[in-house]
């Protein structure tokens, strides 16, 4: 079994789409629009086959998102190398995104940066490698 895709509601569909395309090389479909409900969405495909659906609809409520809360808290991207982590961290910081920590090697062996992503929806963890789960 595998997770087929993960979905999240966002305020600015095109800005969020552009964020994932620019920094993570996502490929985007042409989008979907339901004229009866106003619902819109894009599917973003990443090079390893993972998919993220970003969605929007009229009259959504948007509450303040505390970084310490229950529920989904971050998306982690394995970008392949320490150099790529460093490069993306610098690029995202220069583009105005907040770097919360890193780049650094964590106690469990990840080389990562933690960045507050577009719309502060989640932390974006950039990782150089994945460790095995025990």
Task: Please annotate each region the language model reported.
Residues 11-14, 75-119:
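Vicinal oxygen chelate
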Residues 38, 71, 109:
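Exposed loop/turn and edge beta-strand positions of beta-sandwich/beta-sheet ligand-binding modules
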Residues 65-69:
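Short, flexible turn/loop "capping" segments at secondary-structure junctions
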Residues 124-131:
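Conserved small/polar residues in nucleotide/adenosyl-binding loops
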């Amino acid at each position: 079994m595998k997770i087929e895709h993960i979905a999240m509601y966002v305020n600015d569909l095109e800005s969020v789409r552009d964020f994932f395309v620019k920094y993570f090389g996502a490929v985007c479909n042409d989008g979907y629009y339901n004229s009866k409900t106003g619902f819109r969405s894009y599917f973003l495909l990443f090079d390893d086959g993972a998919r993220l659906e970003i969605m929007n609809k009229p009259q959504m409520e948007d509450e303040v998102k505390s970084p310490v809360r229950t529920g989904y808290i971050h998306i982690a991207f394995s970008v392949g190398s320490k150099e790529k982590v460093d490069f993306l961290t610098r690029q995202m910081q220069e583009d105005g995104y907040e770097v919360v920590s890193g780049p650094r090697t964590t106690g469990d062996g990840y080389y990562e940066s933690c960045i507050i992503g577009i719309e502060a929806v989640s932390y974006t963890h950039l990782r150089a490698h994945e460790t095995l789960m025990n």
